[in-house]
UniProtKB/Swiss-Prot annotation:
Location in or out of the cell: Cytoplasm, Cytoskeleton, Microtubule organizing center, Centrosome; Cytoplasm, Cytoskeleton, Microtubule organizing center, Centrosome, Centriole
Variant or mutagenesis effect after changing residue 339 to A: Decreases interaction with alpha/beta-tubulin
Region named Alpha/beta-tubulin binding: 319-394
Record keyword Aminoacyl-tRNA synthetase present: no
Name of this protein: Centrosomal P4.1-associated protein
Effect of residue 595 to A: Abolishes phosphorylation by PLK2 and procentriole formation
Post-translational modification: Phosphorylation at Ser-589 and Ser-595 by PLK2 is required for procentriole formation and centriole elongation. Phosphorylation by PLK2 oscillates during the cell cycle: it increases at G1/S transition and decreases during the exit from mitosis. Phosphorylation at Ser-595 is also mediated by PLK4 but is not a critical step in PLK4 function in procentriole assembly.
Chief localisation class: cytoplasm
Cellular component terms (Gene Ontology): centriole; centrosome; ciliary basal body; cytoplasm; cytosol; gamma-tubulin small complex; microtubule; procentriole replication complex
Acidic residues bias spans: 1140-1149
UniProt family annotation: Belongs to the TCP10 family.
Length: 1338
């Protein structure tokens, strides 16, 4: 359950924001754990009056808002509170301030976050019913014991509702009062009593949210301690501004700090850790403890202010309720005027200055003893710039920013860093002069300006400390004070932007920071220093006094400017020469980098001519950074050499602001030129100091201090610049050009730093010389830059304007602004030199060189010789670097002014080296330019080549793609064309259609005829087949009859022969001879017949004999015209049975002869002989000896006929081989195949189907088929076929061709293509698939 806040809680919304938002590292943590609602109830019960609650609440607010990054700071704050007599009250008020008057959302968050803290801090609160309520309220959300505390909560809620209504009413009344008061008075931007809208106007755009929150806080806290503001404006402003800048978003910090001295003391104490850390670092380099003394003085002043505030708060205890306390105008309550306070400050600063001078005389020796930082190794130069710089800036920025809201702090510091990097002359003077205009830009400025303000208070405090401390300590305090100055500067800038009336007062606070200088300067400053106080208490009538003092200051400044102009030329020349000599002595080694010294000399000469292009020697970075406000200028000067430089810068700042205020006309007339010149120098100095800070060279205390301070100072410088820019924009007095010039300068310095080659062995020495010169020059230039800080230089804009205008305006402004009274602080020569350095714009001086030089120059304190020659250098923080340079030069501090001779020698040497360096420089520049041009040309060529290659590849790819596409198109078109042609061919023309029709008709007719013929042929074939069968049967029957009749005939013949034998013996003999012949043939045939009978016809013997005898008869027929008569008698010889034959043989044998080899020869009566061989072979020889028959044992039979024919029968193959006397050989195979081998080698083969094949000796073959087809095979394998229909075919390995009788030729190739040539000349070609490839019609 969330409880609605009361009016006290609404007012405490500011505190809530501070508690909740102040420190980015501790974001979301509420430092004061008191629950505002419960506390409000508690306060009612405790009847705490306004006087007690108000300062307490203020202290609590400051305490809760403490700007500390670490818990130690919180502890320190607690210590401060414990020291604070009003601590119990603060504890009471803590609860109220814990939760600011925020919207419901923030309140809810506060309620959530508060419970835990409330329980933790129960003991801290006064034990009463309110504490019990607190415990219940906080335990409820944490432990969820709502049942136990319901009653208490209900009561509390009712009370809270009542209180809330009352407080809201009171708040509205207070706001109305504040509005009325504000309408009559110009309030500070951070402390604006205006409503949210108006207060936001004075805030930066990023602060709008916090502005709303702040408005709630302002009514209750604004001007709680006017006495404190009056009495210690500079210190309080510094702390308040620093805190305010830290919480730039909230703007509550300033109000809270002002609310009570406790707040202020706590704020100081919060800043103290940072400053103490800086002091510690400074003490490392500077054994003296002046900074500590300064701090003590500041704390004492703060305590006094707190006492005054407490008194006033006691007086203001009229209000019964904390939230109802009236907001009284601080002006009426002031008991001490700002002029009085300035007088006191001036006295303190004079004392500190004296002490510093004494310590400076003592300090250089120990400082001189410190080892010189060795040259940077490769890669360390830029790395040290960037890394160290970023580290220091980050660390210090974080310190400054922690009090600011995280969101605002980050952008502010980012802007600061960027701006610091740029060459910018701070516009603090312009801001002071243009405060009425600044109000317009107050929003933008509050961010950057807030940082600057916080830095300014630090600078003021540091300036006080510096006056007490030696140069080293001054530098240390300068670092610490940088944050204060920044705070002050931010605060003052905001005040100036919000308070047009305080325009004159703005320079006065700047003087307040610088009051430590001279009384004369302090007098000038009095109006300036009163500025911050008057800003804080803008309502006081002191403004009029300030304005009067400002007018007087303007007159004095104008006089100083005139003096400066007169002495400028001479002083510039002398100062430059002296600085060069000092650097030369400090950096004895001269190398190619020593050309920087020559460069500086040239630049000095160019400055006189108005062509100074670089601000390297003029490096018054602190001035640059702080020119926006003299305090900020002091911070930068402190950054340079927080000792003398702080003094000088403070003094310079005051006069500068005075000048800017008093001589607003002059600033208007000369601001552009002067500011340009000063900004050049300041921007250069800033760059040097920034570089030095980044480098963090431990050799010189000033370097280390400046490093730390640079982080701080750089931030304010950017803020101051922003303020200056805004003020310039707002005020016609400020040159618009200057704002951009600032940033541009920083950029140029950066560029120069980058351009410088830190690796050069002598760059460090050159840089140190340059730096020393720059520091010396920058000290005056700082003052001038403070006056000219309004001028900002953009790198884009030419420095020629500065050079032209710097000679005049820079001299005047430099004298006045630098010293307030240039004669007082600086000798005329030095002032001239400073202005000269400002004019000088060392164009290419790189940041690295500036850094290294600044390191070297910073490391040793300014030598006494330098102080003797140029007393103005002593107070300036840059003088520390100069002192370091003098130490390097081994010029003892005690050396009398008689060292001018040595300085002259050094000058001559430097001039000689300068000429040489210039030569190297020119050559190097030309070479670098040529190299750059060559590299650019090569790069361009490479790019062109790469582009050409790429274009070529693309073009080739495109051409190839186009080619492929065209090929695909062609293929498609070809396919389409082929299809078209094929389709066209498939459609015959009219003539062809007629022919086709005619042919079809003829084919139909022929088919019909063929069918009829086939029918007829089939019938004829069947008829003939039946006839053949009948004939075969008849033939068989006839043969059977013949056999029977032959048997009968033989029987009858035998009987007749037996009868006649007895009668005719002689006839017998004749018959015997003939019978022998016939028997021989008959035997051979008979044996064959027997074999046939056994194999084929075992049941019949006659048919085989007949069939056996048939072949000889056929053979006879086949023989050429040979008669078959000899065969005919064989048939009757075959018929007699073997028995009969044996009987007949037995009867016919006349004799038998046995041979020794076992063969037996029988002689028959008819004269034939039979020889039987032992192996079964039988040989028969006819009576005439012409017919010989040999029957072999294997069944083969060989017959030699009377006509010399030889018939050989192969029993196994059943083949008959007949050889004729002329050489013809005829083979009869059992299958019916007949082969004839002619003597000439020709062979004729007749197959059973009556096909005749002729084989010619030359290899040709000819086959004649029964249908009349003739096939001829050539020796080459070609085959020619002639059909009976007149067609011819030719078969080769490549093709087959058919020729038709009508002349058409069709050829089929091996690949399947078909080509047809018609008699008309038409040619048609088809592929293997039958597709028509070509068809020509003639």
């Amino acid at each position: 359950m969330f409880l609605m806040p009361t009016s006290s809680e609404l007012n405490s919304g500011q505190n809530f924001l501070t508690q909740w938002m102040t420190n980015p590292s501790r974001a979301g943590v509420i430092l004061n754990r008191g629950f505002p609602i419960l506390e409000a109830d508690k306060e009612k019960r405790a009847a705490v009056d306004i006087s007690t609650s108000f300062p307490i609440k203020g202290t609590h607010f400051s305490d809760s808002f403490s700007f500390i990054n670490e818990e130690d700071s919180l502890l320190e704050e607690q210590k401060l509170e414990s020291n604070n007599p009003y601590k119990p009250q603060s504890d009471k008020s803590e609860t109220h301030t814990a939760f600011p008057c925020i919207k419901k959302g923030p309140q809810v968050a506060a309620c959530h976050s508060a419970p835990g803290h409330q329980e933790e801090n129960k003991n801290d609160f006064i034990p009463d019913l309110a504490s019990e309520f607190k415990e219940g309220a906080y335990k409820d959300p944490l432990f969820k014991k709502l049942e136990q505390l319901k009653e208490v909560q209900q009561k509390k809620q009712e009370q809270l509702k009542r209180q809330q209504l009352e407080q809201l009413q009171r708040l509205m009344e207070e706001q109305e009062k504040l509005l009325t008061m504000v309408s009559g008075q110009c309030t500070l931007p951070g402390l604006s009593l205006l409503p949210d809208d108006q207060s936001q106007k004075h805030r930066s755009p990023g602060n709008t949210t916090t502005g709303e929150r702040a408005t709630c806080c302002f009514p209750s806290y604004v001007y709680p301690d006017p006495t404190q503001e009056e009495t210690y404006p500079s210190n309080i402003l510094s702390h308040e501004q620093s805190n305010f800048c830290r919480t730039a978003h909230g703007d509550f910090v300033l109000t809270s700090k002002r609310a009570s001295p406790n707040l202020f003391s706590e704020a100081q104490y919060q800043e103290a850790p940072v400053e103490k850390n800086n002091l510690k670092e400074e003490n490392r380099n500077h054994p003296t403890g002046e900074s500590i003394l300064c701090w003590e003085k500041v704390t004492e002043q703060i305590q006094e202010a707190n006492d005054k505030n407490l008194q006033k708060h006691d007086d203001s205890s009229e209000v019964a309720n904390i939230e109802e306390r009236p907001i009284k105008a601080a002006i009426g309550e002031r008991k001490q005027t700002f002029e009085d306070y300035l007088e006191e400050q001036i006295q303190l600063e004079e004392q500190e200055l004296k002490q510093k001078q004494l310590k400076e005389a003592e300090g250089p020796l120990p400082i001189k003893a410190k080892p010189k930082q060795p040259f940077l190794k490769r890669g360390e130069g830029l790395a040290r710039f960037t890394n160290a710089k970023s580290k220091f800036q980050k660390g210090k920025e974080s310190k400054l920013v922690t009090n600011q809201s995280t969101s605002e702090d980050q952008p502010l510091f980012k802007m600061d860093r960027q701006q610091l990097q740029r060459k910018t002359a701070l516009k603090n003077k312009e801001l002071c002069a243009d405060n009425p205009i600044l109000k317009k830009d107050s929003k933008a400025r509050t961010k950057s300006g807030s940082v600057t303000l916080s830095q300014k208070p630090k600078m003021l405090k540091c300036s006080n400390r510096k006056s007490l401390s030696p140069s080293g300590l001054k530098i240390q305090t300068g670092k610490k004070c940088d944050g204060q100055f920044r705070d002050q500067i931010k605060f003052e800038n905001k005040v100036t932007s919000n308070n047009k009336e305080n325009v004159t007062e703005c320079p006065k606070p700047c003087d307040t920071g610088c009051t430590g200088w001279n009384k004369t300067q302090g007098k000038d400053r009095l109006p300036l220093s009163t500025g911050p106080a008057s800003r804080l208490a803008a309502k006081s009538p002191i403004r009029e006094t300030m304005k009067e003092s400002e007018s007087s200051l303007d007159v004095s400044l104008q006089k100083k400017l005139e003096t400066w102009e007169r002495e400028k030329e001479k002083e510039n020349l002398e100062l430059d020469e002296f600085l060069f000599l000092e650097q030369a002595a400090d950096e004895i080694s001269f190398s190619s980098n020593s050309s920087f010294v020559l460069k500086i000399l040239e630049r000095d000469q160019q400055i006189c001519k108005g062509h100074r292009m670089s601000s390297t020697p003029v490096k018054a970075v602190p001035q640059k950074t702080n020119p926006a406000d003299p305090i900020s200028h002091c911070n930068r000067s402190e950054d340079l050499d927080h000792t003398a430089r702080e003094k000088e810068s403070e003094c310079e700042v005051a006069p500068k602001q005075l000048h800017s205020l008093s001589s607003a006309d002059e600033l208007r007339e000369q601001p552009c030129k002067i500011r340009k010149a000063v900004q050049k120098s300041t921007s250069e100095n800033q760059t040097e100091w920034n570089a030095r800070d980044d480098e963090g060279v431990p050799n010189s205390d000033s370097s280390t201090d400046s490093e730390e301070q640079l982080d701080v100072t750089i931030k304010p410088s950017t803020e101051d610049r922003e303020r200056g820019i805004s003020s310039r924009e707002d005020s016609p007095q400020v040159c618009d050009d200057k704002g951009p010039f600032k940033d541009t300068r920083t950029q140029e310095d950066k560029r120069r730093d980058v351009d410088l080659d830190l690796s050069d062995k002598d760059y460090s020495s050159d840089e140190s010389i340059m730096e020393s010169i720059k520091h010396k020059v920058s000290e005056p230039s700082r003052s001038s830059s403070l006056s000219l800080s309004k001028m900002d230089f953009d790198d884009e804009r030419t420095w020629t304007d500065l050079e032209e205008n710097l000679c005049n305006h820079d001299v005047v402004l430099g004298n006045e602004s630098t010293y307030g009274t240039p004669q007082t602080c600086y000798p005329n020569n030095e002032i001239g030199i400073l202005d000269k350095t400002i004019k000088r714009k060392i164009a290419p001086v790189k940041r690295g060189e500036d850094l290294s030089k600044s390191r070297r120059s910073r490391s040793p304190p300014t030598s006494e010789l330098m102080m003797k020659f140029f007393p103005s250098l002593k107070p300036k923080p840059k003088s520390d670097s100069h002192l370091g340079n003098e130490l390097k030069l081994n010029i003892s501090q005690d050396q009398p002014p008689g060292d001018n001779a040595r300085s002259q020698v050094l000058r001559e040497k430097i001039i000689e080296l300068e000429t040489e360096i210039e030569k190297f420089k020119a050559e190097n520049a030309s070479l670098a330019k040529l190299r750059i041009e060559r590299e650019s040309a090569l790069e361009k060529l490479r790019k062109e080549i790469a582009d050409f290659e790429q274009q070529k590849a693309k073009e080739l790819a495109r051409i190839e793609e186009f080619k492929k596409e065209e090929m695909r198109k062609l293929q498609k078109e070809r396919k389409v064309f082929e299809k078209y042609t094929t389709a066209a061919r498939t459609f015959p023309d009219k003539k062809e259609r007629e022919e086709i029709q005619t042919l079809k008709q003829q084919i139909a007719d022929l088919r019909e005829d063929l069918k009829r013929k086939e029918t007829k042929w089939s019938s004829t074939h069947s008829r003939l087949r039946s006839q053949i069968q009948m004939l075969v049967r008849e033939n068989t029957d006839l043969r059977e009859e013949i056999k029977v009749m032959e048997r009968f005939r033989l029987d009858a013949w035998k009987r007749a022969e037996a009868i006649e034998s007895s009668l005719e013996v002689e006839k017998k003999d004749k018959l015997a001879n003939t019978s022998v012949r016939f028997q021989n043939s008959q035997i051979s045939s008979g044996t064959q017949v027997e074999k046939y009978k056994k194999n084929y016809l075992p049941m019949q013997g006659n048919p085989p004999r007949r069939s056996k005898s048939a072949p000889p008869r056929d053979l006879g027929n086949l023989d050429k015209g040979q008669a078959a008569s000899p065969r005919e008698p064989l048939e009757p010889l075959n018929f007699p049975d073997p028995e009969y034959k044996e009987e007949e043989e037995d009867q016919d044998i006349q004799g038998e002869i046995s041979h020794p080899d076992g063969k037996v020869e029988k002689v028959y009566k008819n004269g034939c002989r039979v020889i039987l061989f032992p192996n079964g072979t039988r040989k028969e020889v006819s009576a005439d000896g012409k017919t010989i028959t040999v029957t072999f044992f294997n069944g083969d039979v060989k017959q030699v006929m009377p006509d010399q024919r030889v018939i050989y029968y192969y029993a196994a193959a059943q083949t008959t081989h007949t050889t004729y006397p002329e050489g013809l050989e005829v083979l009869h195979f059992s299958s019916g195949q007949i082969e004839k081998h002619y003597p000439d080698g020709r062979k004729e083969i007749t197959f059973p189907d009556q096909t005749v094949k002729n084989l010619f000796p030359d290899g040709q073959e000819e086959s004649i088929f029964p249908d009349g087809t003739i096939v001829r095979v050539q020796r080459d394998g070609n085959k020619l076929i002639e059909f009976n229909n007149g067609q011819r075919e030719l078969h080769t390995a490549q093709f087959k061709r058919r020729e038709y009788p009508d002349g058409t030729v069709k050829t089929v190739y091996a690949n399947g293509h078909q080509e047809t040539k018609y008699r008309s000349g038409r040619i048609r070609v088809k592929d293997k698939e039958g597709n028509v490839l070509m068809d020509t019609e003639l």
